[in-house]
Amino acid sequence: MLQTTANLKALLLKKSVRTGTFTLASGKQSDLYIDCRVTAMDPFGAAMIGDLGWHAVRSKIHSEKLSIQAIGGMTLGADPISLAIGMASARQNPDEALQVFTVRKEPKGHGAGKQIEGNFAPGQNVIVVDDVITTGGSTLKAIDAIEREGGHVKFAIVLVDREEGGRQAIEARGIHVIPLFTRGTLLD
């Protein structure tokens, strides 16, 4: 896993990390922009995210003896990460395969008016996913939507924690956050 971590870090630095002046989704100004979608939608990046993510998720599930049925988060950032981890779970441990879902920013205005799409059912224990957390706002919105629909969020996994308070905001809700990288580990 160490080589996979190093390779994923190199790909994130090459494809996803930009310096300059940026306005983040949280509205905050930053000198660093991390667009994980570019790496997560690269086939090699997705494979590494899937393997590392599944390793981290499976370790947590087994150490705490959790029963988890599905994984997902707020579209669009969480989608390729959730799918990569779900695919890795099915490939590596078929008996523990995680179903995948996505959370819309708002409920659909037509049809069934659903906010959660894919393989999700009320009463399930799930993992919430995000690509990058800054304030934790997007992740908390996804958690709120999942809980409104009857899901039970057991923990969160994030590709990069910018270390700007988001992890603490999510954990204040009693939901542990597993970052694959932090700003510090990514940039060191």
What are the language-model segments listed below?
Residues I61, S89, N93, G150:
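Active-site catalytic pocket residues across diverse enzymes, especially alpha/beta-hydrolases
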Residues V132-I143, G166:
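Acidic, divalent-metal-coordinating active-site segment for phosphoryl/phosphodiester hydrolysis
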Residues S82-I127, G137-L140:
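Short, glycine/charge-rich flexible loops or terminal/linker lids adjacent to PRPP-binding catalytic cores
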Residues G53-I68, I143, E147-E149:
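Phosphate/pyrophosphate-binding loops at sites that engage ATP/ADP/AMP, CoA/4′-phosphopantetheine
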Residues E64-G77, I157:
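Short glycine-rich phosphate-binding loop at a beta-alpha junction
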Residues M1-S63:
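Active-site-facing substrate-recognition patch
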Residues L2-L11, D144-D188:
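PRPP-dependent phosphoribosyltransferase catalytic core
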